[in-house]
């Protein structure tokens, strides 16, 4: 199959199942992180993955084509966002879709107890079409050169820390109508006064409809009803291969230790809620309690 600049590689059937939660990714030489990312999102409850690969030569394609729940497309263009939008509009309509980078792990309030399909069912119930997230850079409490990751192991076992503060929110006129700044990258770029802070807000979880488009990465999208709850993307760029991902934009080297006064070790979603980095609401909390109670066997 050829669609725009995407050519289908695998020949697996794609079932017509509207209940599937589908993830969409772009890959290029991502074998170091790929299995860890796929495992995390499978455990959340993602049913099927659609991947646009930009010509990987490090074994990424072999891993993708060997996975029975992954559909692989060769991307021949330079615009990864256009490829994602093409895939989403071909295979996403009617589904809850999760669009992430291979270096990102999606988390949301109560993700430890509430599987992603049930969380999406809750969002449907309250009339939401999407959920926004903050991107949190994860790093080790040791020099960057020591953050050697073993493929397939949990990424948090290699990089378990993030900046707990400061983060700032500003309003904008593009959906989701706000942007978040701060965190580690702002710290590395000279602080909030330097004017170099990258945008950390994303809209990765969307109930896709025909004609929707991501506009500037996954940070902006054509207008949708954004949920009053918020999640996070744990971002694992700062492994020992950091130069391939962010070495050009940041003044860091193998001896740099990113651990600082604002660093905390990731624990769970409750911690992120307490820090004000993600958000829950009472109706979601009550839904989780009911779901948990229904699973608990009654004593005789």
Regions found by a protein language model. Give the residues of each.
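Conserved donor nucleotide-binding strand/loop of the catalytic core
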Residues: 65-82, 167-168
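N-proximal low-complexity "stem/linker" segments adjacent to membrane-targeting elements
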Residues: 1-35, 39
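Catalytic-site signature of metal-activated, phosphate-bearing donor transferases
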Residues: 110-300
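A conserved acidic beta->alpha catalytic loop
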Residues: 53-66
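Active-site nucleotide-sugar/metal-binding loop of Leloir-type enzymes
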Residues: 85-100
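Glycine-rich, basic loop-to-helix element that forms the pyrophosphate-binding segment
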Residues: 37, 78-89
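Short, acidic, metal-binding catalytic loop of nucleotide-sugar glycosyltransferases
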Residues: 39-48
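The conserved acidic donor/metal-binding loop of glycosyltransferases
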Residues: 101-106
